[in-house]
Amino acid sequence: MKTPASLFVRRLNGLAAAALAVALAATACTPPPPEQKPQGKYPWHTNIVATTFWVGEIFNPNAEDGSQVTSTYDSRWMGSYGGCDGRITSEGCQTEARSGSNGYAPSGVKPKENPFYLDLPYDDIHNAAAFRERATVIPWANDEGYKGQDTNSSFSYMKNRWVKIRKDGKECYGQIQDAGPGEYQDKEYVFGTNDARPANKQFNGAGMDVSPALNGCLGFGDLDGESDKVDWQFVDQKDVPPGPWLDVVTTSQVK
C-alpha cells in the first residue's frame, strides 16, 4: 500500500523533531569546557607557591642570600628603595598588612622605587651559567633595549621586567628586583612553555617571592607564609594596565 505524501512528510518532521530533542538533551548534559586563560605572548605558570619577602628583611643572617637589605641586582637595595618596606620593631624590619586605600604602600616610608616587586629563580648577573646563556634563553633578549647586552655585567635582562600575577580572580602586576627563592638558574620553570614545576624544594617548593604590596593586592591568606598559590606570566611594559603598580616604576639597572 502506498503512503500518502502528507503522511510521509509528517513522519519526516516527527523524526527530525525527535533527533533535535535528543541533541539538545545531550548538549544540556555536557559540562562546559574549563575556563581557558588567554595565552598571550608569554606562557602561563600555574598553581605556583608564592612566599613573601620585603626590602630590609633579614630572615637568616648566616645565609648568603638571607638578607633583603641587598638584592642580587642592587647592593644598596634598602637605600635605593628608601628604607624598610614595613615597620621597624625591636626585632628589626618587619612586614605589615597592606591596604588598597593608600595603594598598598608601607606605613613607615615613602618608596622611591616600585613597592610592587618580586623575584624569580633566575639570576642573570651573579650565576655564572645563567649569565653565559641568558641571551639564548630569555625570550626578550633580542628586543629593543636588550639586544647586544649579553656580555655587559652591569645590565640585567631580568631586573625591572613586568610580571602579571593572578590569585582567586584578582590580578596584580609587579617588577622583578631580585632572584630566588632557593634556585638561581631554573630556566625550565622560569622560561619553559610546558608549565614546569620549580626546582626549588625549600619553602614548600615556592617558585616566587612577592612584596608586601603584592601580598595585599592579591589577597594572600598569610602575611609571611608558604601556602598561597598563584598563576603568573611575563608581560611587556606596554601591556601593563593602569593601577597602583604604576605609581612608582623602577628603572635603575645593576648597582
List where the protein language model places each region:
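Bacterial N-terminal signal peptides that target proteins for export
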Residues: 3-16
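Bacterial N-terminal signal peptides
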Residues: 16-27
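Secreted/periplasmic proteins
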Residues: 33-255
